[in-house]
């Protein structure tokens, strides 16, 4: 996990782009970014030699007591890493959006998967008491997540699920039978 990036911005900044290119040039296979307090895109980047790297630019907040609507949205990353006779690779990846639920009149916070979140829960989220947040809703969350994650995001399941080509991506052919982890 890394990246120090611009807070509250939904797209990678120049600092993230610099580190992404550096890690790609060093043969890194997967990067999971944090810090901006908002969800950012997930993508596969590649270099001119064909090396591919999976990048979660920012998972946003998993739990937050901040006072703005976008900061209530985060994500859980999941990927399948495979090691076989050809090396190590990422077979598929996923992002499950989550919503922070602040309870009115209590110092209690919990997290829901977006797929389990309802309009009733959204209308009861104490974020609605904060300035500029009275219109926080399930629809707001769904729209923002779709905007950030793009075409691979499945609104019907509230998930980003990507299966890669049969050989996976991020092949690390330097792996041997005695050395088994992706970088």
Predicted regions and their residues:
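A short C-terminal boundary segment appended to hydrolase-like catalytic domains
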Residues: 69-183
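Active-site-proximal loop/hinge segments that shape catalytic or ion-binding/gating pockets
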Residues: 7-8
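Conserved beta-sheet core of the metallophosphoesterase superfamily
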Residues: 14-75
């Amino acid at each position: 996990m890394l990246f120090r990036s611009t807070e509250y911005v939904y797209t990678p900044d120049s600092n993230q782009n610099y580190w992404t290119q550096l890690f790609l040039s060093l043969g890194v296979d997967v990067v999971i970014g944090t810090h901006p307090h908002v969800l950012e895109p997930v993508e596969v980047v590649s270099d001119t030699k064909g090396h591919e790297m999976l990048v979660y630019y920012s998972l946003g907040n998993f739990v937050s007591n901040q006072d703005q609507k976008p900061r209530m949205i985060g994500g859980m990353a999941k990927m399948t890493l495979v090691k076989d006779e050809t090396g190590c690779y990422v077979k598929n990846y996923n992002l499950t959006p989550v919503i922070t639920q602040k309870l009115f009149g209590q110092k209690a916070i919990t997290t829901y998967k977006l797929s389990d979140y309802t309009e009733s829960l959204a209308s009861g989220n104490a974020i609605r008491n904060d300035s500029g947040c009275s219109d926080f809703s399930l629809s707001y969350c769904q729209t923002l997540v779709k905007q950030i994650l793009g075409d691979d995001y499945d609104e019907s399941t509230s998930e980003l699920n990507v299966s890669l080509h049969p050989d996976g991506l991020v092949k690390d052919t330097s792996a041997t039978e005695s050395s088994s982890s992706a970088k």
